[in-house]
Swiss-Prot record:
Pfam families: Cytochrom_C. Belongs to the cytochrome c family. It comes from the Eukaryota. Binds 1 heme c group covalently per subunit. Disulfide bonds: none annotated. It comes from Ascaris suum. Electron carrier between complex III (ubiquinol-cytochrome c oxireductase) and complex IV (cytochrome c oxidase). The keyword Flavoprotein does not apply. Keywords: Electron transport, Heme, Iron, Metal-binding, Mitochondrion, Respiratory chain, Transport. This is Cytochrome c type-1.
Length: 112
């Protein structure tokens, strides 16, 4: 697997607002169309209590890390065939790294 760039928080914030915020939050335990992303690093796929995941997500059994998120965000439907997520992915490595950096930093903050 290629080395993951460090990522830029502010650029990642823009990517999150443009590509993720419609379905996900990162600052609370709330769910929208998609589950909260708060605490995703180190969490097993399909594990947010009360969220109705696809069978594919529940059965994947991946633990989310910088590396697994980096690969997943390239092409979610290829990484987890059968996922309900409609997001096509981020082809640019820098955008994926920026988004991961933003999520990592937001997850360090107390939830609202």
């Amino acid at each position: 697997m290629p080395e993951i760039p460090e990522g830029d928080y502010e650029s990642g914030k823009k990517v999150f607002k443009q590509r993720c915020l419609q379905c996900h939050v990162v600052d609370s335990k709330a769910t929208k169309t998609g589950p909260t992303l708060h605490g995703i690093i180190g969490r097993k796929s399909g594990a947010v209590p009360g969220f109705d995941y696809s069978t594919a997500n529940k059965n994947k059994g991946v633990v989310w890390t910088r590396e697994t998120l980096f690969e997943y965000l390239l092409n979610p439907k290829k990484y987890i065939p059968g996922t309900k997520m409609v997001f096509a992915g981020l082809k640019k490595a820098d955008e994926r790294a920026d988004l991961i950096k933003y999520i990592e930093e937001e997850c360090k903050k107390p939830i609202s």
